[in-house]
Design a protein with these regions (language model features):
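Cysteine-dependent hydrolase recognition
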Residues: 1-371
Length: 371
């Protein structure tokens, strides 16, 4: 909470707009250790995760009561449990960003150095480059069913591209034969692009989807393949629909929690680093920033797949960019606001979770496309 109070002070006295949190996890077994503090939401939606990471806590400084702004500590019932929502126990939160927050979840000084170099390279070289005119959408049939003609991820990537003027789309889809293995994903990324949109399923180590009407087959990419990415200097902003792709509290040290070893292995929380952060901090390739979920993603199958839940959230980033918001933190925060305008987060705990867990791993002051 000291960090949040410092941000409040800086906002009121220095007029800041952007806050970059630098630091990820650095060990700890019984208790996690962090280079930069984190906040866990205690929203329990009935799934098997009663907590998840949320940096939105650091962005939402004020709540408004009778037109007056007061500090929002995310503990309105005063019981010391932040962002609580479990049955009748519920903290009333504002959740609208007052500053633009992003995180570099670096685990050592070398990662910090390389991320600074990567950001400088992007902002000083991307402008006017041919590769920046590309949009890459990677998807398939997210919820395959023989009687369902809708390929949800493919529809989402197409809808995202429709917000973009002056760009060329490369749809790497299972239905058009361009997505059959991780090599197809690597080849598409290696050509460089402004925006990279995955829409499907995920965990902290991998992202994947299905061919049409075939739920037994998975096509995707995991972190062990990231060393093959070679789009050096042609870094996209990456938007990811799927579960846990930016769950940046993962660690190989979790394998020492022997009592929960089966669950840890199954949920891939033993990954050295999360998929989203690994994509971002990849040297010589990967993304310049990644926006993805720290917890379970939630999607709507079928005809209404773009109108609710996670797919709808994915699209709000592109809507924001289409309106001229090209500073990454503002683009991200505006997308959160658009979602909450349509789905007030205090009315539904899943909508609330979707907003809280939509994490920006990157520099919030980054100018998309460079200077």
């Amino acid at each position: 909470e000291k960090v949040k109070y410092f941000i409040k002070d800086a906002l009121e006295n220095w007029g800041i707009k952007y806050v970059m949190l630098v630091g990820g996890r650095h060990g700890g077994v019984g208790a996690e250790k962090w280079w930069c503090p984190v906040r866990y939401s205690n929203l329990d939606d009935g799934s098997d995760e009663a907590q998840f990471l949320t940096d939105l806590y650091f962005s939402d400084i004020y709540r408004y009561e009778n037109g007056n702004a007061t500090f929002d500590d995310w503990d309105s019932n005063g019981n010391g449990i932040f962002a609580e929502w479990k049955m009748m126990k519920k903290d009333n939160l504002d959740m609208y960003p007052d500053v633009y927050v992003g995180r570099l979840a670096c685990r050592n000084s070398y990662e910090v150095k390389k991320m600074v170099e990567k950001i400088i390279t992007y902002e000083t070289t991307a402008k006017g480059q041919d590769w920046f005119n590309r949009f890459v959408g990677i998807a398939g049939d997210t919820y395959p069913d023989d009687g369902d003609p809708y390929y949800e991820g493919e529809l989402a990537t197409e809808a995202a591209f429709n917000y973009l003027d002056g760009f060329q789309a490369d749809y790497v889809w299972a239905s058009n034969g361009k997505l059959s293995n991780e090599g197809d994903i690597i080849s598409a990324i290696d050509q460089g692009c402004a925006f990279l949109h995955f829409s499907g399923h995920g965990n902290p180590m991998s992202w994947a989807t299905h061919p049409p009407h075939n739920g037994s087959v998975w096509i995707g990419i995991d972190v062990t393949k990231f060393p093959k990415l070679s789009n050096d200097g042609m870094y996209p902003v990456c938007i990811v629909g799927g579960c846990h792709n930016s769950q940046f509290n993962v660690s190989v040290l979790n394998l020492l929690k022997f009592k929960n070893l089966k669950t840890i292995y199954y949920h891939s929380t033993w990954s050295p680093e999360s998929w989203g952060w690994w994509m971002t901090r990849k040297i010589g390739g990967g993304s310049i920033a990644t926006i993805a979920n720290t917890g379970y993603g939630y999607g709507e199958p079928g005809a209404d797949c773009l109108e609710f839940r996670g797919r709808y959230m994915e699209l709000q980033f592109f809507k924001s960019y289409s309106e001229g918001k090209d500073m990454l933190g503002e683009t991200h925060a505006s997308g959160l606001a658009y979602y909450m305008d349509k789905f007030p987060p205090m009315d539904d705990n899943v909508d609330c979770k979707i907003v809280q867990q939509w994490e920006l791993l990157g520099d919030p002051s980054l100018k998309i496309g460079g200077y």
